From Swiss-Prot:
Sequence similarity: Belongs to the LeuD family. LeuD type 1 subfamily.
GO biological process, one term: L-leucine biosynthetic process
Annotated gene: leuD
Function: Catalyzes the isomerization between 2-isopropylmalate and 3-isopropylmalate, via the formation of 2-isopropylmaleate.
Record protein name field: 3-isopropylmalate dehydratase small subunit
GO molecular function: 3-isopropylmalate dehydratase activity
Species per Swiss-Prot/TrEMBL record: Thermobifida fusca (strain YX)
Reactions catalysed according to its record: (2R,3S)-3-isopropylmalate = (2S)-2-isopropylmalate
Pathway: Amino-acid biosynthesis; L-leucine biosynthesis; L-leucine from 3-methyl-2-oxobutanoate: step 2/4
Length: 195
């Protein structure tokens, strides 16, 4: 997993609320067995509309998605996180996320930042007025900065540490490989091994 400390980039204003995981990536795109190649399925139904925000050239280099409230509702779908990452997004800002989506995102290295809805609206207006506006998502100091906006956000210490170290569940397990091997040596021979 890629480390996340501070990211500065352009943003994409997604003025939709209640975006569910099937809208993020429809089920027809979930047939791969790898974590890559899902960017084509991201918001696939909406991308058929030439006026959809991701089709606008001024937002093609966006790395921060500013979404409406209740982003990521619906079924638990890690592919939704992968599609956002494969497209190039490093962070998603919203006033509310579905719990399961947020958990999948943070475990997968996609920072989801909860900000007050009035701040989300300020950021939408700022980015729509000037698509070249850069936003900084600072995990070290737990704040989002853009022009005259400096907004703190909350994230528990453990999740913050994992993101800053670039550690997913497998990486955390591998940190204990010696202890696991030692445990296996002490197990009774008739018990199954855990390797």
């Amino acid at each position: 997993m890629e480390k996340f400390t501070v990211h500065t980039g352009r943003a994409v204003p997604l003025r939709y609320s209640n975006v569910d995981t099937d809208q993020i990536i429809p089920a027809v795109y979930l047939k791969r067995v790898t974590r890559t190649g899902f960017e084509d399925g991201l918001f696939a139904a909406w991308r058929t509309d030439p006026d959809f925000v991701l089709n606008k050239p001024e937002y093609k280099d966006g790395t921060i998605l500013i979404a409406g409230p209740d982003f990521g509702t619906g079924s638990s779908r890690e592919h939704a996180v992968w599609a956002l990452q494969n497209y190039g997004f490093k962070a998603v800002l919203s006033s509310r996320f579905a719990d399961i989506f947020r958990g999948n995102s943070l475990k997968g290295g996609l920072l989801t930042v909860v900000l007050p809805q009035p701040v989300i609206e300020q950021l939408w207006e700022m980015v729509e007025a000037d698509p070249a506006t850069e936003i900084t998502v600072d995990l070290v100091n737990r704040e989002v900065r853009a022009k005259d906006i400096v907004e703190p956000f909350e994230l528990d210490d453990y999740t913050r540490w994992r993101l800053m170290e670039g550690l997913d569940d497998i990486d955390l397990t591998l940190r204990h490989v010696d202890a696991i091997a030692e445990y296996e040596k002490r197990r009774k021979p008739w018990l199954p091994v855990t390797q």
